[in-house]
Design a protein with these regions (language model features):
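P-loop NTPase Walker
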Residues: 1-79, 179, 233, 237
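Conserved helicase NTPase motor core
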Residues: 1-2, 32, 40, 60, ...
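Short alpha-helix boundary/capping elements
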Residues: 17, 68, 119-126, 208
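Short amphipathic alpha-helical segments
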Residues: 45-47, 73, 94, 201-202, ...
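ATP-hydrolysis module of ASCE/P-loop NTPase motor domains
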Residues: 56-58, 76-162
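Short, intrinsically disordered, charge-balanced linker/junction segments flanking boundaries
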Residues: 239-242
Length: 242
């Protein structure tokens, strides 16, 4: 479903969930609704409950990160203490900048930009050997990226992109775990689909298979709201993929 801002896209999702439950006899626990922000997920849940006149049904509403982290928690026993705080990630990059004796003009800005680039490489599933940094030489970026990954691993920490990458790897390597989640979530609905990145899309495609009951809502002209690494062309190619 493609439509502009304020046209009722969210309403379409909540009404579709109601229709699936009431008209199609779908088990509420097998429905997964994914959004991009925690606030959007909470609002969607509230609107759905209001629509159902207060009936609390076990439909899952959550962000990509919340949904995928819950999958990782069950597989690897992770908990909230494993999620890196922003200052921890920043400190790792700053220590690497000192270690590599890099001369940067504005350390805070440079650190922020490098973390954004690391996120982009993970989210778009890029090969590090073919990524050209906008902020430093390819050789230095590779050292920063690898140093960051090692430090995170040594500390037992995950960033938000790791949640996605690890979930992708888990589903790729453990068909039994993938099948269990495919059987749990038989109907998947996604809001603001134009903000999706490559790794999120690949996980969703695996999770939705083999039934492919995938319902997406987005605005093909919302590039101004683009999330980190979002690829609007994924949405535009959706009909070709399915």
């Amino acid at each position: 479903v493609l439509a502009g801002p304020g046209s009722g896209k969210t309403t379409v999702i909540t009404h579709r969930v109601k229709y699936l439950v009431e008209q199609c006899g779908v088990e509420p626990g097998s429905i997964l609704v994914i959004t991009f922000t925690k606030a959007a997920a909470q609002e969607m849940r509230q609107r759905f409950e209001k629509l159902m006149e207060g009936r609390r049904l076990p439909v899952s509403f959550g962000t990509f990160h919340a949904v995928f982290f819950s999958i990782l928690k069950r597989a690897y026993r992770y908990d909230a203490s494993n999620i890196a705080r922003e200052e921890q990630r920043t400190r790792i990059i700053r220590e690497l900048v000192d270690k590599l004796r890099m001369d940067v003009e504005d350390e805070a800005e440079f650190t922020s930009q490098i973390l954004t680039e690391i996120s982009l490489v993970k989210g778009e599933m890029m090969d590090l050997d073919y990524y050209y940094s906008k902020n430093c030489s390819e050789e230095l970026f590779k050292k920063l990226y690898q140093g960051y990954e090692k430090a995170m691993m040594d500390k037992g920490l995950l960033d938000f992109d790791d949640m996605l990458v690890l979930c992708y790897e888990l589903f790729t390597q453990r068909k039994d775990i993938l099948t269990a989640w495919q059987n749990k979530y038989r109907y998947i609905l996604i809001d603001e689909f134009q903000d999706i990145n490559r790794v999120q899309y690949e996980i969703v495609r695996m999770l939705a298979a083999p039934r492919n009951n995938l319902f997406i809502v987005g605005d093909d002209d919302q590039s101004i709201y683009r999330f980190r690494g979002a690829k609007p062309e994924i949405m535009l190619g959706f009909e070709k993929d399915y």
